[in-house]
């Protein structure tokens, strides 16, 4: 005996599959621009650091770099706003976890407490950015 499918059942199954596919594409479409937005944020941060004003005192140096750092995080949250639900929360979680790494001279340490020297920030900066972007890319691929 076997299962007999007439045209109605096949059409219903196809309609459900197409509806699921359309919903998945719509959800994925919301995140289409997230990598472009995130890369734009990184480029903007890089440009700010490259055009960093010379000859400032230490306090002004730290304040300037921390402004760039906070602008980067604001830009990233904006890029994630239209993405799938929870992406902004995941970014905030990654940010908090990165603060807990306690890397001496990191931007989290430097900008969170207002202490430190501008010279100690440069070695940790690229490592931190790569770690954050790799974690974000890994999370968004699932």
From Swiss-Prot:
Signal sequence region: 1-27
Keyword Magnesium carried by entry: no
Lipid-bearing positions (GPI-anchor amidated glycine): 116
Keywords for this protein: Cell membrane, Glycoprotein, GPI-anchor, Lipoprotein, Membrane, Signal, Synapse
Top-level taxon in the UniProt lineage: Eukaryota
GO CC terms, sorted: AMPA glutamate receptor complex; extracellular region; extracellular space; glutamatergic synapse; plasma membrane; presynapse; side of membrane
Keyword Transferase: no
Subcellular location: Cell membrane; Synapse
Propeptide segments, given as residue ranges: 117-142
Biological function: Promotes neurite outgrowth and especially branching of neuritic processes in primary hippocampal and cortical cells.
Protein name: Neuritin
Organism: Homo sapiens (Human)
Native organism taxonomy: Eukaryota, Metazoa, Chordata, Craniata, Vertebrata
């Amino acid at each position: 005996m076997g299962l007999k499918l007439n045209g109605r059942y096949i059409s219903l199954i196809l309609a459900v599959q197409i509806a699921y596919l359309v919903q998945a594409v719509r959800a994925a479409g919301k995140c289409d621009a997230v990598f472009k937005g995130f890369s734009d944020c990184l480029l903007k941060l890089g440009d700010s650091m490259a055009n960093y004003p010379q000859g400032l005192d230490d306090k002004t140096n730290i304040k300037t770099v921390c402004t760039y750092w906070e602008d980067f995080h604001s830009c990233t949250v904006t890029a994630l706003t239209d993405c799938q639900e929870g992406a902004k929360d995941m970014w905030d979680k990654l940010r908090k976890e990165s603060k807990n790494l306690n890397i001496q001279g990191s931007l989290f340490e430097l900008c969170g407490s207002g202490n430190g020297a501008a010279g100690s920030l440069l070695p940790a900066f690229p490592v931190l950015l790569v770690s954050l972007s790799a974690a974000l890319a890994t999370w968004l691929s699932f």
